């Protein structure tokens, strides 16, 4: 069978493309390397590593993918529904700095262009403001007052059925959509919602798309793409099979790649430099890769329970360029605590910060031991998600090697991405004093000066020319017909807030 379009990836961009194409009557196949989930399939805690983490090489087929490079650490989602399965439901419209970024402002007034599509995305994702102030939110509000930024403190907008009851109903689509239950506020959003309250993509865009004829092929990885005889040829292999990689080839007239910024760049760089099967892709593929100018730090060991409500419930801006949210895991989901150590101030070299951490651990042994033996870390800890609109970027490159090659992130340019954001550190320390908790930094940031992000963006610059961009202003790939990219890789700048709503609106 020859499809009208094949979509690779079922995250926000891929789900939008799939629904809007089948609505127009096209025959569409969606290829997703991850698994399909029902609410009861999700793990009860993130200690259930085979169900939580995506590491196919050791037969872990969860939905949380952790990618470690020498210059950056990246968290992303895998499965039918992509990042929506693991994200913290937070749906924000960015500040004006993003829309005015020089990387794309010459193509139009993006705030005005995207306004109706933000409305459409908000409707589909069920965007609604969380209204409660829990203990941890009130502490963040106190910090905002201390930093003369109380006017920026607010509750967040989320895509969760926060007003529902235990009885199943369709709160979003007037009875046309799937049934849901109400949120029980367990903070389990990032471990997979077992309550069927989270408005994930398989419950909105993909649900309707399948009703209209979309074919979804899960547990299948797109490995090679070629274009000849006016058709795209997609060579795939099974990801989860016990009996080797079952290979299949699919053909289509058009192609949408939306495998997430990381997945899209790996797939396309491989086609250009490993297989030479898409040789006309732009030479700037992989450039302008961004982390959303993001860092993560934490406070743990507080005397009170700090993981109430949803995974993210409140936010404030300590300065005009910075957006800080508190992030929580549910009870008994302590696996992520091992990524954190005692906090160390200063944007020094990794050697200097590592030495400071060693000295602090030796001179404050009780503090160190409290973090190690804190078996209720997810209950008494909050993580600070610090995001900025500051314009910095890295570059993703493909390195051919004896074993097939690999991706590498180059963070040496003029717009080097920092691993340490001083204003975020200050928020963390002020918060720690108020809850008598212990400030913590991510160890990889301290030891290797390596930024960590849950929101990798960019890598496919926008331009009128193939020499300076991968896509045009309509997200069409230069050099090939009916080939589009609709995920985070086409976001042209650091958003400074959670990017899911923007990726959805841009795809719309």
What are the language-model segments listed below?
Residues 7, 11-12, 262, 415, ...:
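Residue-level detector of alpha-helix initiation sites
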Residues 49-132:
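Redox-cofactor-proximal catalytic regions of oxidoreductases
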Residues 109-219, 449-452:
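Conserved redox-cofactor binding core of oxidoreductases
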Residues 5-30:
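N-terminal Rossmann-like FAD-binding beta1-loop-alpha1 element of flavoenzymes
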Residues 114, 428-429, 502-508:
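An active-site-proximal "capping" alpha-helix that borders the catalytic cofactor pocket
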Residues 61, 186-189, 227, 382, ...:
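A glycine-rich dinucleotide-binding beta-alpha-beta segment and adjacent secondary-structure elements
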Residues 68, 83, 87, 93, ...:
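FAD cofactor-binding and catalytic pocket of flavoenzymes
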Residues 23, 34-39, 43-44, 195, ...:
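Glycine-rich loop(s) and the adjacent beta-strand/alpha-helix scaffold that form part
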């Amino acid at each position: 069978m020859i499809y009208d379009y094949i979509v690779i990836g079922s995250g926000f961009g891929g789900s939008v493309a799939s629904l809007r194409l089948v609505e127009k009557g096209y025959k569409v196949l969606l290829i997703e390397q991850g698994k399909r989930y029902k609410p009861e399939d999700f793990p009860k805690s993130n200690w259930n590593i085979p169900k939580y983490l995506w590491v196919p090489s050791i037969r872990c087929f969860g939905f949380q993918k952790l990618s470690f490079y020498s210059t950056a650490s990246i968290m992303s989602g895998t499965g039918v529904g992509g990042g929506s399965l693991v994200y913290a439901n937070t749906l924000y419209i960015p500040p004006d700095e993003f829309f005015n970024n020089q990387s794309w402002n010459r193509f139009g007034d993006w705030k005005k262009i995207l306004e109706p599509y933000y409305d459409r995305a908000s409707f589909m994702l069920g965007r609604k403001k969380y209204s409660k102030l829990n203990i941890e939110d009130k502490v963040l509000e106190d910090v905002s007052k201390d930093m003369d930024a109380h006017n920026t403190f607010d509750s967040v907008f989320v895509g969760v059925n926060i007003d529902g009851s235990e009885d199943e109903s369709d709160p979003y689509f007037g009875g046309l959509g799937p049934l849901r239950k109400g949120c029980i506020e367990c903070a389990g959003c990032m471990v997979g919602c077992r309550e069927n309250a989270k408005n994930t993509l398989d419950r909105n865009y993909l649900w309707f798309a399948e009703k209209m004829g979309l074919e979804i092929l899960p547990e299948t990885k797109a490995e090679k793409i070629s274009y000849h005889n006016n058709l795209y040829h997609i060579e795939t292999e099974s990801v989860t099979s016990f009996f080797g990689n079952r290979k299949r080839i699919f053909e289509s007239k058009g192609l949408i790649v939306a495998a997430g910024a990381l997945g899209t760049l790996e797939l396309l760089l491989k086609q250009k430099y490993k297989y030479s099967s898409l040789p006309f892709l732009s030479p700037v593929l992989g450039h302008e890769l961004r982390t959303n100018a993001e860092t993560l730090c934490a406070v743990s060991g507080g005397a009170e329970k700090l993981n109430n409500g949803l995974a993210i419930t409140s936010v404030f801006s300590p300065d005009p360029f910075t957006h800080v949210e508190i992030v929580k895991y549910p009870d008994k989901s302590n696996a992520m605590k091992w990524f954190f150590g005692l906090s160390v101030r200063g944007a020094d070299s990794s050697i200097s910060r590592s030495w400071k951490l060693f000295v602090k651990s030796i001179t404050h042994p009780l503090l160190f031991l409290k973090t190690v033996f804190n078996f209720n870390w997810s209950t008494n800890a909050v993580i600070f998600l610090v995001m900025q609109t500051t314009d910095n970027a890295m570059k993703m490159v493909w390195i051919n090697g004896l074993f097939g090659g690999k991706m590498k992130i180059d963070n040496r340019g003029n717009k080097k991405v920092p691993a340490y954001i001083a204003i975020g550190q200050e928020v963390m320390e002020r918060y720690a004093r108020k809850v008598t908790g212990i400030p913590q930094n991510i160890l990889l940031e301290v030891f290797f000066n390596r930024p960590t992000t849950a929101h990798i963006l960019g890598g496919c610059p926008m331009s009128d020319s193939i020499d300076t961009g991968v896509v045009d202003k309509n997200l069409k790939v230069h050099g090939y017909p009916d080939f589009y990219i609709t995920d985070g890789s086409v976001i042209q700048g650091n958003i400074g807030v959670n990017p899911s709503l923007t990726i959805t609106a841009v795809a719309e």
